[in-house]
Amino acid sequence: MPSTRDIRRRIKSVKSTAQITKAMQMVASSKMQKAQQGALNFRPFAKMAGDLVNHLAADSGDYRHPLMETREVRKRAVIVVSTDKGLCGGLNANLFRELSKYDLSTTQFIAVGRKPAQYLARTRRKLVAEFAYHDIPTYAECQAISKFAQDLFLKGEVDAVDVLYTRFINTLSQRPDLRLLLPLASAQSLATEAGAAPAGAPDDHQHFDFLFEPDPVTVMDKLVLYLLDFRVAQILLEAKASEHSARMVAMKNATDNAEQLVKHLTLEYNKLRQSNITKELLEISSAAMALG
């Protein structure tokens, strides 16, 4: 049976742990708000780009880009986007569980974040590249990932590129999501994914006629690549929002559990202390009666 000294030491240790998890909860909460705000601020920009692609697609007829080439999928690349650190509940475990669906002999992997890189290396999967990204991803980081995927596809090394990441739903809910990055859909579908209204659909915004130089197709060739970068950026922002949300919830649960444990240990300490006092009083009373 533990002594009162042992219980006091354990209470002190648990309180110290609770202070650490509380601080980590506050940091994750602050980062989560920034990541969510970054995703929200990005949406209008992505929508405007989608509107422009939609307008160009209507003017350029049956536009086709090399990244839109559809072929039989014999080899596939998967971009796995996850965290650099742990302590985020089951977020990484739930995401990595989805990797079991892929045939290792025909699939190569691209890690975005340290945790997926470590997992892929540990499970002996074919890791061809590793990328890092900040809490608010820079355009250069998004472009590097996008460019690497484009090169694999255009050189014929893979026939399709998927992105596996954790989709942000709300603070308490994040879900693994699989998105096809390459080949790209048609121009109209690509614009719709970016948030634009489908061609011919009613729109509340005023329409304008644009004059493109040198021609819509040349502009489209550039814009399609930008839209691909935007899709990568949106995925990275959602992954970061999911990470910080999961970490905040995990640290909050750890803090709550520590506080409950402190209450339980304090009650146990008081009971043991009361029992010791009662025992000492009985011993004193018994000794007094024996002397009397």
Feature locations, PLM:
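C-terminal beta-strand-loop-alpha-helix "lid" module of Rossmann-like NAD(P)-dependent dehydrogenases
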Residues: 1-292
